[in-house]
């Protein structure tokens, strides 16, 4: 379907709105500069972004007593792309609000493509990505693989979290077989349930003393898990659709929470598919960690692991060293890249 062309009047209105936004940002920057030069803001302080609301941020910092306080801050016009988890330099005003003047170097950043295919940061300075899936809605292995590839591309440690294990049959479950395969590859798999006593013990241990981010389909129970992990927080929990068994989105902005036992958790808006269109084929292959010993050992340097003779990956699949299901998942992802 071709895109609808804008009329001359519509283009003028769009350009006018964009110009007004740019002018407001410039006026705000001038006010900030004037206030900073006049000493209306206090000295520079260190803080961490705990939530993002458009042109304003929620920044957490210690007060004079060492207690953590959160302040609503706005950004200098020359600062773009700040996300929850960023460590920043900011200055506070007399009314408790503030202005963020700089971002400190990131240790890690989680990015995913936006609607235009441009990489957009989601969270920063995180130690592990918790990929949450559930017995219901039923997880699809290829979707799990997409999350794993995306995590491997960032260099951030992924952990698989199976939620709603109280719904899992004791024996004969295909899901149990799937989890065993991921464990055999080398991934950590954590079981969780909000309906069973001690059902979150393993998850608590996994989260302690780390900054983690939850990702996963809507409806897998992320908000319910956080409600239990953070009993003082009240998060709206969406109900599963009786028809599609797909969940409703319950979180609208990425937010950082402190866990009672130590560590932090960043909850980000639910997504149903993790786009990988920004990756090249060789990056996808690297994201399948069991492929790595065989990459670079094909007969041809430009082997695409299709029908080429002497393909080390295909030979490994035939020997049973690589699961055929994982190789098929890889091919499905790579084939999707060719249509972008």
UniProtKB/Swiss-Prot annotation:
Binds 1 zinc ion per subunit. GO terms for biological process: ribosomal small subunit biogenesis. Residues 20-42 are annotated as: Disordered. Zn(2+) binds at residues 298, 303, 305, 311. One of several proteins that assist in the late maturation steps of the functional core of the 30S ribosomal subunit. Helps release RbfA from mature subunits. May play a role in the assembly of ribosomal proteins into the subunit. Circularly permuted GTPase that catalyzes slow GTP hydrolysis, GTPase activity is stimulated by the 30S ribosomal subunit. CDD domains: YjeQ_EngC. Keywords: Cytoplasm, GTP-binding, Hydrolase, Metal-binding, Nucleotide-binding, Ribosome biogenesis, RNA-binding, rRNA-binding, Zinc. Its EC number is 3.6.1.-. This is Small ribosomal subunit biogenesis GTPase RsgA. The gene is rsgA. GTP binds at residues 163-166, 216-224.
């Amino acid at each position: 379907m071709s895109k609808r062309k804008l009329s001359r009047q519509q283009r003028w209105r769009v350009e006018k709105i964009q110009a007004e936004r740019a002018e407001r940002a410039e006026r705000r920057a001038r006010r900030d500069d004037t206030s900073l030069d006049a000493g209306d803001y206090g000295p520079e302080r260190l803080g961490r972004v705990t939530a993002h609301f458009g042109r304003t941020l929620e920044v957490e910092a210690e007060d004079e007593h060492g207690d953590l306080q959160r302040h609503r801050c706005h950004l200098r016009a020359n600062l773009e792309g700040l996300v929850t988890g960023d460590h920043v330099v900011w200055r506070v005003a007399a009314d408790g609000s503030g202005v963020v003047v700089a971002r400190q170097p990131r240790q890690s950043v989680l990015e995913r493509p936006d609607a235009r295919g441009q990489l957009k940061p989601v969270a920063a300075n995180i130690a592990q990505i918790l990929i949450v899936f559930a017995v219901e809605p039923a997880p699809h292995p290829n979707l799990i693989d997409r999350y794993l590839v995306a995590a491997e591309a960032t260099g951030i440690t992924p952990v698989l979290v199976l939620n709603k294990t109280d719904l899992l049959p004791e024996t004969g479950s295909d899901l149990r077989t799937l989890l065993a395969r991921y464990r055999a590859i080398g991934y950590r798999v954590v079981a969780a349930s909000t309906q069973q006593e001690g059902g979150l013990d393993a998850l608590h241990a996994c989260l302690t003393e780390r900054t983690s981010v939850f990702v996963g389909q809507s409806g897998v129970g992320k908000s319910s898990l956080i409600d239990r992990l953070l009993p003082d927080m009240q998060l709206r929990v969406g109900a599963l659709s009786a028809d599609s068994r797909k969940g409703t989105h319950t979180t609208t902005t990425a937010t950082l929470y402190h866990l009672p036992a130590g560590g932090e958790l960043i909850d980000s808006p639910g997504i149903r598919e993790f786009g990988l269109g920004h990756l090249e084929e060789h990056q996808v292959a690297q994201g399948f960690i069991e492929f790595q010993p065989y990459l670079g050992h094909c007969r041809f340097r430009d082997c695409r692991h299709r029908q080429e003779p002497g393909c080390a990956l295909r030979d490994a699949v035939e020997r049973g060293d690589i699961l055929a299901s994982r190789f098929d998942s890889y091919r499905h992802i790579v084939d999707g890249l060719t249509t972008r």
